Amino acid sequence: MVALVGVLPAMPAMAQNGAANGGANGAAAAGAVNLPPALQAAIQSGNPAAVSQAIATLSGGNSQRTAELATGVVAAAERILKTNPQAAVAIATVAVESVRTDAVSKGSPQQVTTVVTIAARIFVQPDVQRLAPEATANLASSAVQAASTTNNPTLVATIANQAVSAAEKVLAAAPAAAVQVATVAVQAVKEQPVTQGAPQQTLQVATTAARIIVNPEVQRLNPQAVASIAVATVQIASTPAVYQSSPQAAISVMDNSYKAASSQTVVAAAPTVVQTVTRELVQASQNGSLAQSNPTNSKEVSDILDRTNTVNRPPADQANNQNNQNNNNNNNNNNNNQNNNQPVVPPFTPAPTSPT
């Protein structure tokens, strides 16, 4: 448990705002200072469960009040980011979880936007990623899910992009958590309003996710998630609006996704994934809209399939040696068969000569 005593000093709201945030987040920072004493005490205890309970009790089930309190809590988390990054992540996660419901997002969409935006500023920090990689990944996943409730395509794509970028940064330390973030982010941007409303950021999410799933450790830990991401990222990259934002980046997504799907580890867990991804790639190679954005699209997509198939085939020398061995075996078998089929000739025995 992380002690937070003294993180909310008693000072005038405007002075606190200016010192901590330079005036950039006035409302959020002021809300952090004006938190009810019970909530301040919960934050200072360093107990995330106590913070969550305090929000629930003080809001009384009122979604707007929940959003207000969560905004203040996440602002308090950002305040202590430099001095206590681990505590900042824990507190911010509670705030984000509080606004993940549809009732809160519909009643207070602007405050939900503020909460997830501040949360993203926390989980992209290198110190947070280094000291608390799994907690950082969990915060990133929650922020994407909360953003998705707002039905704001730009917000969803922005938070998802930041989240999957953070996931890639913590990949070595927390591969299982990283692939979970990638799963959530890809599913969030796969929806049509997002692919159409924020195609460039959507493609960036797919690009980063595809890089994550080629990692062998990720494939070992969660091959089924890798298979799911591989299919989804190919579908995203082959969406005309997304593809045309950067055809070469889209081709790279397809390439990495197919490599991941073709991994023996992934195929063992999801036997149909190669067939599914192949079908998506074939459709992409025949898509006229993609060809308009990139005249060499068909060839480039076909090359992905050819390269992967070549990798899966034995080397030419090995194949030739195998063929030669097979031919030798066949020749030996034929010789044996011919020998077996020769008529048996009895040994020559000279006739006895008559005595004269």
Annotated model-derived regions:
Residues 6, 351-352:
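Short, low-complexity polar/charged micro-motifs in intrinsically disordered terminal tails
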Residues 16-334, 338-343, 347-348:
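Non-catalytic all-alpha helical scaffold/repeat segments
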